[in-house]
Amino acid sequence: MKTILSNQTVDIPENVDITLKGRTVIVKGPRGTLRRDFNHINVELSLLGKKKKRLRVDEWWGNRKELATVRTICSHVQNMIKGVTLGFRYKMRSVYAHFPINVVIQENGSLVEIRNFLGEKYIRRVRMRPGVACSVSQAQKDELILGGNDIELVSNSAALIQQATTVKNKDIRKFLDGIYVSEKGTVQQADE
C-alpha cells in the first residue's frame, strides 16, 4: 500500500541559516558551513514560515522504504545543525597490556602516527578526514581528542584510527590492545 503524503519538519535555531538549492542543503552557523546533497532521494525539500525557520521534507506516494527516507533526511539535517552550532568531539583511549602505544600527531592534527603497537617497528599512519582535527589530551594519559563539524567525518576518522590498530593472527579475546572510542559528545556544551 502506498501512502499519499508523508512529511516531517525540522526546526532551525536562530543562529543557524539554511539555504536550499534543489535537493542540496547548505547549513551556516557560528562554527562554519556544511553542505549535503540529497539528489539521490526522491523527496521535496522546502523552507516554511516568514523567517524560513522550519525545513519540511515531503515524500509523495512512497512505499515503506521510501517513507523511511523522510526521517533519515531530517536526522541528517539535525546533525548538520548540531555540528555548526556545537561541533562534535570523539575521545579515544589507547589500551595496551605490555608494549605502550606511542601516538604522535603530525601536520597540525591532520595525521596520526601510531608507533610501538604490540612492539612492532612498523609505523601506522592515519590521515584524518578533511575538517577533522586531532590532538593529544593534556588532562588524561593515552587519550586522543578528535573534533569537527561533520559527525560523519569525525566518526569515520575515529573508525580509521581504530581499524589501524586491529590485531592480526592472534586471539582477539586475549590481545585487546588498540585505540578505542571512549566518549562521544559535542565540543561546546549545550545550554539547557
Swiss-Prot record:
Pfam families: Ribosomal_L6 (PF00347). This is Large ribosomal subunit protein uL6. GO terms for cellular component: cytosolic large ribosomal subunit. GO terms for biological process: cytoplasmic translation. PANTHER family: 60S/50S RIBOSOMAL PROTEIN L6/L9, LARGE RIBOSOMAL SUBUNIT PROTEIN UL6. Keywords: Acetylation, Cytoplasm, Ribonucleoprotein, Ribosomal protein. InterPro entries: Ribosomal_uL6-like, Ribosomal_uL6-like_a/b-dom_sf, Ribosomal_uL6_a/b-dom, Ribosomal_uL6_CS2. Its main location: cytoplasm. It comes from Pongo abelii.
